[in-house]
Curated annotation (Swiss-Prot):
Signal sequence, renumbered to the chain: 1-26
Top-level taxon of the source organism: Bacteria
InterPro entries xref list: Amidase_6 (IPR024301)
Keyword Signal belongs to the record: yes
Keywords (A to Z) from UniProt: Signal
Pfam name, any one: Amidase_6
Protein name per Swiss-Prot or TrEMBL: Uncharacterized protein YjcM
Keyword flag Signal: yes
Length: 409
C-alpha cells in the first residue's frame, strides 16, 4: 500500500511541471495573438492616416489630384468634387482640411493587408467658415511584398508617412512615422499599389467625373441665381406642375410647434454618426434620417408617418404623403435662398424605379437644410453620410430635379 501511494506521489510530481508548462504556453500564445492583432490594427490605422495626410497636403496646396497613388484621390472622389465646386465655382476661400479615423479593423487575405475603417473628411470654406463633412466606410487593400528586393524597396515607403512636403528643388520628401520600427518587424507593405474602395455608395449612385460634374454644378448655380432674381421681382406662382417645374407650390396648413432649428441641430449631430436609438438602413437611410430630424423638431407622429412606416423611410412615399390632405402638411415652395429656411426638406428625383436615369416624379433621395451661409443653402443626409453639402450637389452629381418642402408656423 505504501509503495502504491509513493508511486502515485512520484507520478503527480513528475506531471505537475508539464501541466504548468502547457498553461504558460497557452497563456503566452493568447497574449502574443492579442498583441499581434493590436499591432496589426495599429498598422492599419497608420496606413489610413498616411493616405489622409497626403489628401490634407494636396487639398491645402490646391492640387487634389497631384499624388493619386498615395492619396487615393480620383476625379470622381466626392471630396474632390465638393472641394472643386466650392473653390472653383462658388469662389469660396478654403480654410482647413481635417479628418477622423474610427472603427479600424485589419485582416490579412491573399497576401494583402485589408484595412476597413470609417473616415470623416472635413472641409472649411467661406467667409462664414461652414464645415462640409463626408463620412465614409472604406476598405484599403495593401499588397504585401515578398521578395528580398521588394522588401528592401518597401522599407523606404511602407513604414513612412506619405504626407509629402515639397522642398526648394520641388522634390518630394517623405516624413517617417514615429513607430516605423514596430511596423517593419511585422510586415512589408506596398502602399503605392494599394487600392481604395468606398463601402457605402447609395444604390444607383453615379460615378460622374470632375469635368462633367463642374459643368453641371456651374449651370445649377447659374439657374439658382436666376430664380433668386425672379423671386425678388414677383410673387411665387401657385401652379402645381410636377412635370415641368422645380419650384412647385402646394397650399397646405402648417404644423403648429415645429422647430426647424431643433430639426437642424439634430441633423447636425447625427449626420455623420447615426443615432443608435433608431434603426439604420444601410445604403437607404436618407428618409429615415430626415424623419428623425423632423421628429426632433417636435413634429407629432401620424398614422402613416411614424417609425418605420413607408412614409417614414421611403423617399417617394414620404414626398407623396406630405402632399396629401391630413397628417403632415408641408408646402412645396420656391427653391431660392431668400425663401428656404433651416429645417426645410429637399427631395431629389434622378432615376426611375428600375434605375434608369430620368426623373419620373417618384423621389429617390431626401435631405434636410442645415445651413444658410455664404449666400448658399446647405443640406445634410444619410447614405452616404454628408453634412452641409450645397443643395446643388446631388443634382449636379446624379442629374434629375429637386424640390423643397417647407413647414411654416
Amino acid at each position: 500500500m505504501k509503495k502504491e501511494l509513493l508511486a502515485s506521489l512520484v507520478l503527480c510530481l513528475s506531471l505537475s511541471p508539464l501541466v504548468s508548462t502547457n498553461e504558460v504556453f497557452a497563456a503566452t500564445t493568447n497574449k502574443e495573438t492579442k498583441e499581434n492583432v493590436s499591432i496589426t490594427n495599429e498598422i492599419g490605422y497608420e496606413k489610413v492616416k498616411d493616405m489622409l495626410e497626403q489628401q490634407k497636403y494636396d487639398f491645402e496646396h490646391n492640387t487634389p489630384l497631384a499624388h493619386p497613388k498615395e492619396s487615393k484621390l480620383t476625379d470622381s472622389d466626392e471630396g474632390v468634387l465638393l472641394y472643386s465646386a466650392l473653390s472653383k465655382v462658388d469662389k469660396q476661400k478654403f480654410h482647413e482640411f481635417t479628418y477622423d479615423i474610427d472603427d479600424v479593423k485589419t485582416s490579412e487575405k491573399n497576401n494583402k493587408l485589408i484595412v476597413e475603417a470609417y473616415i470623416t473628411r472635413n472641409f472649411v470654406f467661406g467667409v462664414e467658415k461652414v464645415t462640409t463633412s463626408l463620412g465614409d466606410n472604406i476598405k484599403l487593400e495593401i499588397p504585401k511584398t515578398t521578395s528580398n528586393k521588394q522588401s528592401s524597396q518597401s522599407t523606404n515607403t511602407s513604414n513612412l508617412s506619405f504626407s509629402q512636403v515639397k522642398n526648394s528643388s520641388n522634390q518630394l520628401n517623405v516624413i517617417p512615422l514615429s513607430n516605423s520600427s514596430k511596423q517593419l518587424n511585422v510586415t512589408q507593405l506596398n502602399n503605392s499599389s494599394s487600392t481604395l474602395q468606398y463601402e457605402n455608395d447609395e444604390e444607383y449612385s453615379s460615378d460622374v467625373k470632375l469635368d462633367e460634374f463642374l459643368k453641371k454644378y456651374k449651370q445649377e448655380v447659374k439657374n439658382d441665381d436666376k430664380e433668386e432674381v425672379k423671386s425678388e421681382d414677383k410673387p411665387v406662382s401657385m401652379n402645381f406642375n410636377a412635370a415641368n417645374s422645380n419650384q412647385l407650390t402646394v397650399t397646405a396648413t402648417s404644423v403648429k410647434g415645429y422647430s426647424g432649428y431643433a430639426a437642424m441641430k439634430y441633423a447636425e449631430k447625427y449626420a455623420l454618426k447615426p443615432n443608435k436609438n433608431y434603426k439604420y438602413y444601410k445604403d437607404k437611410d436618407c428618409t429615415n434620417f430626415v424623419s428623425q430630424a423632423l421628429r426632433a423638431g417636435r413634429m407629432p407622429y401620424f398614422k402613416e408617418w411614424k417609425p418605420y412606416t413607408d412614409a417614414w423611410v421611403n423617399a417617394g412615399a414620404f414626398r407623396s404623403y406630405i402632399l396629401k390632405a391630413g397628417g403632415i402638411k408641408m408646402k412645396t415652395v420656391s427653391d431660392t435662398y431668400s425663401n428656404v429656411k433651416l429645417g426645410d426638406v429637399y427631395h431629389y428625383d434622378y432615376h426611375n424605379k428600375i434605375g434608369l436615369r430620368y426623373a419620373d416624379g417618384w423621389m429617390d433621395h431626401t435631405a434636410i437644410v442645415t445651413s444658410r451661409a455664404n449666400m448658399k443653402l446647405y443640406v445634410s443626409y444619410h447614405s452616404t453620410n454628408r453634412l452641409n453639402v450645397p443643395r446643388e450637389y446631388v443634382t449636379s452629381k446624379e442629374g434629375g430635379k429637386r424640390y423643397v418642402s417647407s413647414i411654416r408656423n
